[in-house]
């Protein structure tokens, strides 16, 4: 019987926890740009779980990458299939610059310290060549570019590109390694803001940032809800000199830097009761703060660790330090 999405998210959560990550509660917001936030030391992850990775479209990828830029965090999708095919273990896939791996690849990376070496591209399966090592081995063996090209079955120009760190097809790498008797590929570190791209795209697009015009795409996707409470909160934070970004498909309405991350949501007290644990959990994982703004009078300063302020309380604060001092006090920090 197929796993439910909730069970699968919980399995990914447990895998991260067992590897020493502090993981947020599953927030249950649908649709959402990410399902889990996880931190280990200085590494913060935003993880999205998808059955079929082809469901990740350009707009959703742009939202996820933008959140990764804002926190900042490494974004990662855990998938199961691409079309009708299972994702191969040990292979990194990409959609719109978002790195994607299978649950098995994640477990091997965390439990056995086995990083993936391969990445998928429309042209096949590739690996990134350790160019400096390849050049050193070629020179030491007294091989010319042409000689090694003949052994590998590629052009001299291809060998030059490999020595500059370009990717090569698995079959080509196998021929070179078989002849040299030495490995020449570089592992992919999933938790570094690195380049995980196929040869069909420029190699200077980091996986943790939106490619090309994605910033424009995100700006277009940001909602103009006309919600007076939300707009008032954003205007108030903006008036304090904070950079405020309105979010969509996230368990919070806005994100600001103070310079710590400040997650903010608006709504009724009933909504605050429903979302308090999730927001508080996300703020703790991000090593930031969170607050919930309501219209009605507040009789409880904190719900499940989340500071609750009404509009008038927010308006009393004229600068970020003053606001953060009250939030931290209510959080008990």
Located regions from the model:
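Recognition helix of helix-turn-helix/homeodomain-like DNA-binding domains
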Residues: 152-168
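The alpha-helix within a helix-turn-helix
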Residues: 138, 149, 177
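DNA major-groove recognition helix of helix-turn-helix/homeodomain DNA-binding modules
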Residues: 171-186
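Short alpha-helical DNA-recognition segment
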Residues: 142-156
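Acidic-basic catalytic patches of nuclease active cores, encompassing PD-(D/E)XK
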Residues: 1-27, 183-250, 327-333
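Residues within the helices of the helix-turn-helix
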Residues: 135-136, 146
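Conserved catalytic cores of phosphodiester-cleaving nucleases, focusing on short active-site segments
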Residues: 16, 34-69, 73-76, 237, ...
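Charged, structured surface patches that assemble and position nucleic-acid processing machinery
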Residues: 7, 12-15, 71-74, 79-80, ...
């Amino acid at each position: 019987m197929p796993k439910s999405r909730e069970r699968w998210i919980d399995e990914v959560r447990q895998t991260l926890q067992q590897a020493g990550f502090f993981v947020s509660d599953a927030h249950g917001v649908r649709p959402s740009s990410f399902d889990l936030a996880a931190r280990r030391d200085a590494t913060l992850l935003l993880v999205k779980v998808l059955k079929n990775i082809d469901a990740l479209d350009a707009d959703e990828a742009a939202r996820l990458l933008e959140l990764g830029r804002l926190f900042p965090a490494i974004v990662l999708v855990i998938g199961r299939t691409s079309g009708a095919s299972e994702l191969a273990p040990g292979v990194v896939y990409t959609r719109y610059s978002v790195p994607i791996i299978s649950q098995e690849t994640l477990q091997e990376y965390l439990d056995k310290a086995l990083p993936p070496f391969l990445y998928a591209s429309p042209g096949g399966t590739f690996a990134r060549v350790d160019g400096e090592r390849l050049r050193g081995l070629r020179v030491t063996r007294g091989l010319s570019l042409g000689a090694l090209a003949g052994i590998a079955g590629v052009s001299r120009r291809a060998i030059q590109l490999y020595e500059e760190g370009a990717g090569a097809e698995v079959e080509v790498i196998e021929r070179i390694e078989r002849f040299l008797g030495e490995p020449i590929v570089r592992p992919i570190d999933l938790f570094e803001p690195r380049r995980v791209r196929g040869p069909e795209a420029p190699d200077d697009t980091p996986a943790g940032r939106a490619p090309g015009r994605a910033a424009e795409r995100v700006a277009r996707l940001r909602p103009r809800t006309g919600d007076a409470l939300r707009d008032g909160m954003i205007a108030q934070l903006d008036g304090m000199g904070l950079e405020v970004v309105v979010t969509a498909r996230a368990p919070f309405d806005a994100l600001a830097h103070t310079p710590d991350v400040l997650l903010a949501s608006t709504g009724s007290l009933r909504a605050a009761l429903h979302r308090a644990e999730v927001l508080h959990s996300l703020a703790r994982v991000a090593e930031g703060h969170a607050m919930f703004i309501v219209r009605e009078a507040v009789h409880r300063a904190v719900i499940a660790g989340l500071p609750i302020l009404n509009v008038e309380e927010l308006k009393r604060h004229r600068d970020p330090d003053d606001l953060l001092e009250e939030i931290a006090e209510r959080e008990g920090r």
